From Swiss-Prot:
It is found in: Virion. The lineage of its organism: Viruses, Duplodnaviria, Heunggongvirae, Uroviricota, Caudoviricetes. Functions as a receptor binding protein (RBP) and probably mediates the attachment to the host capsular exopolysaccharides. Displays a depolymerase activity that specifically degrades the KN5-type polysaccharides of Klebsiella pneumoniae capsule. GO terms for cellular component: virus tail. InterPro entries: Pectin_lyas_fold (IPR012334), Pectin_lyase_fold/virulence (IPR011050). This is Depolymerase, capsule KN5-specific. It comes from the Viruses.
Length: 1193
């Protein structure tokens, strides 16, 4: 028997000794073959190879025309035992050509310097490597930090185990305060098309579910991204942004295309196909020609960035690895480097540390998910100072094969037409379904299908045909194909985790297995099978898909089969599922199933009152018995279905109180859909409860006189769920009982009582409350409220906890939508500010409150100010992912201890007016503060951010202006507190930033000042006017000024310590107001714009100047050099250098040297007064006397 190879045998071990194995497979016209696997030498030692004709000739000692599988290692031309790739050839019948199956044998070699990762591996440790940040891809798909992986030190930890063939690619680098890179992470709502970024950058790279979106798939204006098509619920959004503009090249491939001509200058290219990152082993670039190793499909979209995107700071290196054995781990360690930031890719997919894809710990990368055999890991390391005694060269980055060897292997395999990517082997599936050669393609939405084209849907392994445009899932006009009668495709989807043994409901003689579209190799130990059981070397997790192609050889070798069955005349699954299926199944009485059913049970009997007693179930009981059991369980145990009458005009307080009094711990209480009128219902102390209020509206009756009352009061609730609580306070129909105040009364919609813990509230609504929406007691912990809507609330929405309250911890408010609170007119009379959440205590500090996701519109004009948080004695408070309307007075009103406050990812819904972070800072506030930080706050309007000194750091914020005020006497700050603005932008109004109190160091780093200043004000003005603490400094580092006024910085106090370093733009001058002096002035590498006097001050006590340039004079204000001449007959020459030097000139900085010979004078000297320098001689010269003069700043 002869097999002709489609390529050259010179690329493989031509002797085939011990390397070729036969795995029998049965095809329709094949002869019978015994089961088993044989090497060629075992079957026929006379096998030969003819290199000239590329033919393997062997007899096998069996009948001709036998279908089978040949597999052997390719070798690396230097050592045949270290073959990196195993080729498997399917030998079929005359109607189908032979073809290759390509399998990585990663135990032999790897294309990167990293050690080979294990199947199930999540932890990777690399010696001598540290990093702080990483960008990670798995199979070219960007991973989400904090969810997909975590990083710590040198370790990446993935959340979930990776699969065989997954490729990990990591880029690492440092965490720098000076970075221009910004990340935005969010989760999509269903049909969402708009993404609003809390910043503005020149370049924004949008990944959805880790896949890069192409430039023509969305538009971006300012900070708003608009998608051409909508996202689905919970789609992961990840935007990487910076100010680097990188040109790109795009193309759409035609079938089997490999080469593309790139227009533009190629510097450090980054290549994507269909949004998936391609590693440099997948392509080569020669000149402007991009060549892919593998042929592309028609419609594949190619995107090439011509230079590095610099999406992470201080890139050091990259790490790449392929998962190839069976150890159970999920960490990655990056070898040989010290670094502070990295990017991790798994199978080309960028991993995201903030979404939990991995953790870093020293040099150890811990993946959140174990990897599988064949997974490829790639890491780029940034900011990695190499140790002198541990220099890493490029050669060190290859562990087994040299770069030359790997390139030789890649080129040779490419010539053989071998695809080195893990993917379903389409020729194998074509054989199983009897399809023409090269007629099968991978299903991709948007492709056009014509006649005689077939498509493999990779989600479930089914094959489809038809004419039309492919959708997201197969449907009409496409139809699913059945495989050959001799070859059955069976699909299994894991319904739970850790499945490693699977029962196949068929008797089969051979099997090929694909897991999530990846071919598994029994020779590499991926699986074994015994009878109808498959035993996997790893474990499937929920949702994993297994497709088995089963060879039904046993049907043809069973001597007891009838002639009809052997020739395919048997009942198929589709036959049984038809309307006549019951006629094809026989029974023991000689009838078919339909006849037996007709004889045993007639339709009249089944339709009678006791018909349910006749029909049985799998438990052995009748349907009626099963129904009776379910009803009994409801009645006897844990469910109470309320008998409240919905939409009745009667007050049903008494009935509901009676029902809740009968509840015991562990029960479920279900109320009907509709409106229920109640006044006050007290739910007793309970545990393990489920309250299903979905669809019920609890409303206060008209004409009620509530005074101090609660509509729903949970006395004390633990380990319970409350779903759909909707309360309506009916504030427009209550009765005034005070006689003076039409809004008197402290009725609240619902109350959570003392000692409640571990309660989950889902979809909570509060409207029309007279007082607060909800008030809580004390010692409450671990409460989650997810999905909150509120409107027309009299005062606070959540009051936690009022008089007698406190010691409440771990409270999370998620996904809040607030239309209006604080609407009571009495709030104005009492100057009473109201909040979405008010923290208060009298018995102990509250701790760990968090608001995550808030839209606060305030559609009504409030009685007084409304704010997000009134914080009285909550130690930790976190407010993130919020947007507020123009009627909101502020974000925070500090009234007590708050050691840690973080406000992040927030912006104003109105672009014409702003919202201050700090609403008020009263002297009565007993604030104990340790660390406050604001990040990604976008308020680019005219509103001033007052009391800014309460925060320690502002990072990536956009404000109109800022003011600092005096510290109140009761405030206790941490030692060494400073005020920093990092990467901030200020669009100033008609008056500048006012730093009237300089009580600690204030620094502006990488900030931009866009001024609209006119008149006699500065961009940053009145520095230290009211108070300036000695030895404090105001500094501007790497800042850009766009000032059009007559001066840029105005100081006011004689003790000012001012520093400007690496500043640029339109800087007019520094002006000491009110005829004051400057104590200390440092200016370095700074350019002033068009002014003859960069600094105006009565005096400068100490100055340090270097590289201070004035564009109007072109002079360096740290150095002056010239030639002065005393005319014949005169004894002095002098000049005022005030237009050249800033402040007074020291006599020690002046150097004077006579030039050439002269007659008359015997000595000379200099006199310095302020900025005037004069040279004197004792005797007038007879001719002009020239001096070289040099003055340093």
């Amino acid at each position: 028997m002869a097999f002709k190879f489609k390529g050259s045998l010179s690329a493989v071990d031509a002797t085939l000794k011990g390397g070729v194995k036969f795995d029998n497979e049965k095809l329709p016209d094949s002869k019978n073959m015994p089961e088993g696997k044989f090497t060629i030498n075992e079957i026929d030692n006379s096998s030969t190879t003819d290199l000239a004709s590329n033919t393997l000739v062997t007899n096998f000692g069996k009948q001709d025309n036998v279908a089978g599988m040949l597999s052997f290692n390719t070798g690396d031309w230097e050592n045949n035992n270290s073959a990196p790739v195993k080729l498997m050839m399917r030998v079929v019948n005359n109607s189908n050509d032979s073809d290759w199956v390509t399998i990585f044998d990663s135990t032999k070699t790897t294309v990167t310097w990293s050690s080979i990762a294990s199947a199930g591996q999540t932890v990777f440790t690399v010696p001598n490597l540290d990093f702080k940040k990483a960008i990670i891809y798995i199979n070219g798909i960007l991973q989400y930090p904090g969810i997909s992986y975590q990083t710590f030190g040198g370790t990446v930890t993935f959340s979930n185990s990776l699969q065989a063939g997954d490729n990990v690619y990591i880029v690492v680098g440092e965490d720098s305060d000076n970075t221009t890179n910004t990340q935005y992470i969010s989760t999509a709502l269903d049909n969402q098309t708009t993404i609003i970024l809390p910043y503005e950058k020149n370049s924004n790279y949008l990944f959805i579910n880790g896949v890069l979106q192409y430039p023509n798939s969305f538009t971006i204006v300012n900070n708003t991204i608009t998608l051409n098509s909508s996202m689905q619920q919970d789609d992961n959004i990840f935007v990487l942004s910076n100010d680097k503009i990188v040109p790109n090249y795009t193309a759409v491939a035609i079938q089997d295309q490999t080469d593309f001509t790139i227009t533009g200058t190629i510097i450090d290219p980054v290549v994507y196909i269909n949004g998936v990152l391609q590693y440099d082993t997948h392509y080569t670039i020669s000149g402007n020609t991009l060549s892919f190793v593998s042929k592309l499909f028609a419609g594949d979209e190619v995107l090439v960035f011509l230079d590095s995107l610099n999406l992470i700071d201080n890139i050091n290196t990259e790490y790449n690895s392929v998962i190839d054995d069976v150890n159970n781990s999920n960490k990655i360690n990056i070898p040989y480097f010290h670094f502070s930031e990295l990017q991790v890719f798994i199978n080309g997919i960028l991993q995201n540390p903030d979404n939990g894809a991995y953790d870093l710990n020293g040099t150890e990368v811990t993946l959140s998910s174990p990897l599988q055999e064949g997974d490829d890991i790639h890491v780029i390391v940034y900011n990695s100072p190499i140790q002198d005694d541990n220099i890493v060269t490029k050669a060190d980055l290859s562990s087994y094969a040299s770069i030359t060897e790997l390139n030789l292997l890649k080129d040779s395999l490419k010539a053989e037409g071998i695809n080195l990517k893990w993917q379903p082997h389409l020729p194998s599936i074509e054989v199983a379904f009897g399809l023409p050669r090269r007629s099968l393609k991978i299903w991709k939405a948007g492709n056009t299908s014509t006649i005689n084209q077939y498509w493999l849907y990779p989600v479930d392994g089914t094959v489809w045909s038809g004419i039309g445009t492919l959708g997201n899932v197969p449907s009409t006009p496409f139809y699913k194909l059945d495989s050959n009668k001799d070859v059955i495709t069976w699909t299994y989807t894991a319904t739970s985790d850790n499945i490693n043994r699977i029962f196949v409901p068929y008797n089969f003689g051979s099997i090929n297995i694909f897991i999530n579209g990846v071919l598994q190799n029994i020779e590499l130990g991926h699986y074994t099978y015994n009878g109808q059981y498959i035993d996997l070397n790893g474990s499937l997790n929920i949702g994993d898909n297994l497709v088995a192609i089963l060879g039904k050889l046993i049907l043809n070798t069973n001597p007891y089969l009838t002639y009809e069955t052997a020739n395919g005349q048997f009942v198929s699954k589709s036959d049984l599922s038809s309307n006549t299926g019951s006629l094809m199944v026989g029974t023991s009485d000689g009838n078919n199933l339909q006849q037996t059913l007709n004889n045993k049970v007639n339709s009249v009997l089944l339709s009678s009152n006791n018909g349910s007693s006749i029909v049985g179930t799998s438990s052995g009981l009748s349907v009626q018995a099963e129904i009776d059991n379910i009803k009994k369980q409801f009645t006897d145990s844990k469910v109470l279905i309320s008998k409240l009458i919905p939409n009745s005009t009667q007050d049903q307080t008494a009935l509901m109180q009676s029902e809740v009094n009968s509840l015991t711990s562990g029960m479920t209480y279900i109320t009907p859909t509709g409106t229920i009128l109640i006044t006050t219902v007290v739910i007793p102390t309970l545990k393990g409860m489920t309250f299903k209020f979905d669809g019920t509206i609890f409303k206060l009756p008209d004409g009620a006189t509530p005074l101090d009352s609660d509509m729903i009061r949970f006395n004390s609730l633990s380990y319970s769920t409350v779903s759909g609580l909707y309360t309506d306070g009916n504030r427009s129909n209550i009765i005034d009982t005070s006689g003076t105040n039409p809004w008197y009364g402290r009725v609240i919609n619902w109350r959570l009582g003392n000692n409640s813990t571990f309660v989950y509230f889902q979809n909570t609504t509060m409207v029309n409350s007279l007082y607060c929406g909800s008030q809580w007691g004390n010692n409450i912990s671990n409460i989650v409220l997810d999905g909150i809507y509120a409107d027309n609330i009299g005062e606070h929405l959540f009051y936690i906890s009022g008089n007698g309250g406190g010691n409440n911890k771990n409270i999370l408010f998620k996904n809040m939508m607030i239309d209006s609170i604080g609407v009571n007119p009495n709030n104005s009379i009492a100057s009473h500010a109201c909040a979405v959440v008010k923290s208060s205590q009298t018995i102990g500090l509250n701790d760990y409150f968090c608001i995550d996701g808030l839209t606060f519109k305030q559609t009504q004009t409030p009685g007084y100010a409304v704010i997000v948080v009134v914080n009285g004695d909550c130690v930790h408070f976190d407010i993130k992912n919020f947007q507020v309307g123009k009627n909101v007075g502020g974000i925070i009103s500090p009234l007590g201890t708050c050691e840690y406050m973080k406000v992040s990812n927030g912006y104003s819904l109105d672009t014409t007016s702003g919202v201050p972070l700090v609403y008020t800072y009263p002297n009565s506030s007993n604030i104990v503060q340790t660390y406050w930080v604001a990040e990604n706050i976008i308020m680019p309007n005219a509103y001033s951010q007052i009391n800014s000194q309460l925060f320690d750091v502002y990072r990536d914020c956009h404000f109109g202006r800022i003011d600092v005020s005096n510290d109140q006497s009761n405030t206790v700050f941490k030692d060494g507190k400073t005020l920093k603005y990092i990467n901030c932008k200020f669009t100033l109004p008609t008056t500048g930033l006012q730093l009237t109190y300089v009580l600690r160091d204030i620094s502006f780093d990488n900030c931009q000042f866009d001024s609209t200043i006119t008149g006699n004000s500065a961009v940053v003005d009145y520095i230290g006017q009211n108070e300036y603490t000695s030895n404090t400094r105001v500094s501007f580092n790497n800042c850009k000024f766009n000032s059009t006024t007559n001066y840029t910085i105005g100081t006011f106090n004689n003790l000012v310590n001012l520093s400007m370093t690496n500043c640029y733009g339109i800087i007019k001058k520094i002006y000491a107001r009110n005829s004051t002096s400057i104590n200390k002035l440092k200016i370095a590498n700074t350019e002033f714009d068009g002014t003859t006097t960069p600094v105006t001050a009565t005096s400068i006590t100490m100055k340090m100047l270097s590289n201070v340039i004035n564009t109007s004079t072109g002079r360096d204000y740290s150095f002056y050099r010239n030639q002065w001449s005393i005319p014949a007959g005169q004894t002095s020459i002098g000049y005022d250098l005030s237009s050249t030097f800033i402040g007074s000139i020291s006599a020690f900085s002046v150097q004077v040297t006579p030039q050439g010979t002269y007659s008359g004078p015997t000595k000379y000297w200099t006199v310095v007064s302020g900025t005037t320098v004069t040279i004197y001689v004792d005797v007038a010269p007879t001719t002009n006397m020239t001096f070289n003069i040099q003055v340093s700043g």
